[in-house]
């Protein structure tokens, strides 16, 4: 929904496209294949069975971008982050697999990586939001929870004007701390992944955490730095 092509289209057409994606997704999960992309997806589902729900949740997240330009509470933003990013972790964890060391011992229970997978997606999306505050402002969007702006005495008008004051810095310190807490939640699950998947995921986690460090280095000026 963020591409230049998508932004040039009317909301009604974007909504129709998402309806089409939902219909196609349901069809593929039911075994109906119409094109090569469907065939690839069907083959993946056959080899790595999984629930359709994360895919439907992802589409719901895209629908939120058609109507939501503000998020009153963090709970609202967390739901959005789960839908557009946490779902990716649920989609891919079965493909990545779990290290046999955690499943072969007779006393071992197979670990559930779902919570960590969702946490990493939420952490990554929160990081994207913090990095892209200036860009989103230009599109009339504020993803930072309005309850947080109020808590730190920083208004929507302040954000739209790109005001860099102490209230903004205090607000951003709080936001970065929250994002890091979500990264912390995700780290425990990385060690459970299969050897081939562990390092790519760990590298991604470290790179995204590094974006938070970069925001600190520019003194939270995400209006003029990205």
Give the positions of each predicted feature.
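Catalytic cores of Mg2+-dependent Asp-rich isoprenoid enzymes
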Residues: 2-124, 130, 134-226
């Amino acid at each position: 929904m963020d591409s230049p092509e998508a932004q040039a289209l009317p909301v009604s057409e974007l909504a129709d496209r998402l309806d089409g994606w939902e219909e196609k997704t349901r069809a593929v999960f039911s075994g109906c294949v119409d094109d090569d992309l469907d065939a690839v997806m069907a083959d993946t589902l056959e080899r790595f069975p999984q629930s359709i729900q994360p895919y439907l949740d992802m589409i719901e997240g895209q629908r939120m971008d058609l109507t939501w330009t503000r998020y009153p509470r963090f709970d609202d933003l967390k739901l959005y982050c789960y839908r557009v990013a946490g779902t990716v972790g649920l989609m891919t964890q079965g493909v990545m697999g779990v290290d046999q060391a955690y499943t072969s011992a007779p006393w071992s229970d197979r670990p559930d990586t779902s919570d960590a997978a969702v946490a990493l997606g939420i952490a990554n999306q929160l990081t994207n939001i913090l990095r892209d505050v200036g860009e989103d402002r230009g599109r009339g969007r504020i993803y930072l929870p309005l309850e947080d702006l109020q808590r730190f005495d920083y208004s929507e008008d302040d954000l739209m004007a790109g005001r860099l004051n102490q209230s903004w810095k205090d607000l951003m310190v709080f936001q970065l701390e929250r994002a890091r807490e979500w990264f912390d939640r995700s780290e425990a699950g990385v060690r459970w992944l299969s050897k081939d998947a562990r390092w790519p995921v760990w590298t991604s986690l470290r790179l995204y955490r590094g974006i938070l460090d970069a925001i600190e280095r520019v003194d939270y000026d995400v209006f003029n730095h990205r």
